[in-house]
């Protein structure tokens, strides 16, 4: 057993410590804490996943949190740590000392999530699946859930549904919740689904479990509504239980508001990894033509619904791989909001060949963002603006809004 003090927070929700055995990454540990445990080596590094905390950080959050909350610190103390993660990535990975605007806090530190997914526990109730494990962590409540999802959580704890998982998607705008039932037999779930709608759920769908990921298999409506409207700052957009939409709409709305003020406007704009096209629809009044590229059929379907509802005739959705953007030609603005892996080499190469006047880069991973920004700066761009945003309080995750210009 080793006893050691944690030095700093690093990406992934780990505290870093230097010991006689080498660097140890400690899950959920906070800077300055004294911990004890037996680190295990995996992927070439030492990890301690369940430390015994001997001396806690004075700001450690005292109330129970779900396992996903890997930054259990008083909220005001979380923000400088997250800002430091972005600054460190910018300096260490991108090799840049560009100014960083102060982090924008989440409007709500708790009760902010409008989407969540839980496993059904064999003993009843709902549980989190622990990462890289088959272990289930049973929950009595989840303080990260916004209303009305907190109501839905309490209802579902008492329903013995024959499913593997339940997924929730709510709307702060409408005050409603959609429910996804994952696994089980859809025919046997039709009657419970109708009863759940009578109980207060806006709609229920069934989803086939898939090794490819969440809602990658067959999805069948069972009862009630299929979509809801949610407000993301100045924009109202469609969400569904199977959609990949921002789970903190108040924070996402603030980012959209600021993004709109950063760009020049012009003739043509392109959004890669568009999802349902929030940026395309938001910026459509500033450009003559806007093209939204997205690979997900469901996201494109919702984007088209919103485009028609908003009357955005100059927006065009294309269901295609972002790596094939070369075929679309030149644009004044390219918006990119890639997954955590960042931009693939094909997209970075396209940007450096097409040379749009502006690149609006939104990231959910500071390290891959910094890698891509460094490559674009070496290719002739300058980082004109960057600001961290906190979409996920009580977790290590941090978003970045940035603008590059020629």
From Swiss-Prot:
Its EC number is 2.1.1.-. One of its GO terms (biological process) is rRNA base methylation. One of its GO terms (molecular function) is rRNA (uridine-C5-)-methyltransferase activity. S-adenosyl-L-methionine binds at residues 246, 273, 294, 337. The keyword Cell inner membrane does not apply. Pfam families: tRNA_U5-meth_tr. CDD domains: AdoMet_MTases. Belongs to the class I-like SAM-binding methyltransferase superfamily. RNA M5U methyltransferase family. This is Uncharacterized RNA methyltransferase TT_C0988. It comes from Thermus thermophilus (strain ATCC BAA-163 / DSM 7039 / HB27).
């Amino acid at each position: 057993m080793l006893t050691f003090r944690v030095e700093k927070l690093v990406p992934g929700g780990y505290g870093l410590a230097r010991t006689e055995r080498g660097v140890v990454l400690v899950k959920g540990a906070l800077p300055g804490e004294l911990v004890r445990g037996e680190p295990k080596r995996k992927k070439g590094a030492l990890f301690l996943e369940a430390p015994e905390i001997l001396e806690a950080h004075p700001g450690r959050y005292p109330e129970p949190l779900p396992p996903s909350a890997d930054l259990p610190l008083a909220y005001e103390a979380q923000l400088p740590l997250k800002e430091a993660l972005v600054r460190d990535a910018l300096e260490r990975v991108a090799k840049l000392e560009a100014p960083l605007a102060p982090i924008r806090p989440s409007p709500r530190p708790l009760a902010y999530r409008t989407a969540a997914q839980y496993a059904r526990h064999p003993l009843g109730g709902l549980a989190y699946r622990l990462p890289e494990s088959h272990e289930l962590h049973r929950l009595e409540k989840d303080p990260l859930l916004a209303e009305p999802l907190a109501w839905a959580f309490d209802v579902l704890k008492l329903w013995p549904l024959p499913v593997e998982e339940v997924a929730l998607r709510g709307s702060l705008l409408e005050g409603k919740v959609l429910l996804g039932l994952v696994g089980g037999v859809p025919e046997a779930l039709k009657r419970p689904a109708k009863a759940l709608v009578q109980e207060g759920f806006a709609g229920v769908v069934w989803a086939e479990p898939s090794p490819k990921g969440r809602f990658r298999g067959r999805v069948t409506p069972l009862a009630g509504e299929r979509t809801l409207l949610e407000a993301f700052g100045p924009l109202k957009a469609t969400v569904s239980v199977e959609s990949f939409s921002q789970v903190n709409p108040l924070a996402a709305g603030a980012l959209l508001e600021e993004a709109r003020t950063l760009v020049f406007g012009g003739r043509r704009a392109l959004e890669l990894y568009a999802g349902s096209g929030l940026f395309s629809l938001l910026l459509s009044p500033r450009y003559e033509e806007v093209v939204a590229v997205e690979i997900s059929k469901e996201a494109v379907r919702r984007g088209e619904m919103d485009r028609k509802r908003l009357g955005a005739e100059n927006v065009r959705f294309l269901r295609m791989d972002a790596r094939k953007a070369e075929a679309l030609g030149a644009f004044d603005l390219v918006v990119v909001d890639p997954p955590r892996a960042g931009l693939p080499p094909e997209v970075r190469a396209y940007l450096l060949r097409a040379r749009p006047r502006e690149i609006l880069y939104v990231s959910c991973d500071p390290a891959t963002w910094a890698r891509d920004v460094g490559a674009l700066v070496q290719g002739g761009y300058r980082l004109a603006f960057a600001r961290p945003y906190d979409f996920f309080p009580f977790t290590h995750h941090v978003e970045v809004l940035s603008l590059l210009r020629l």
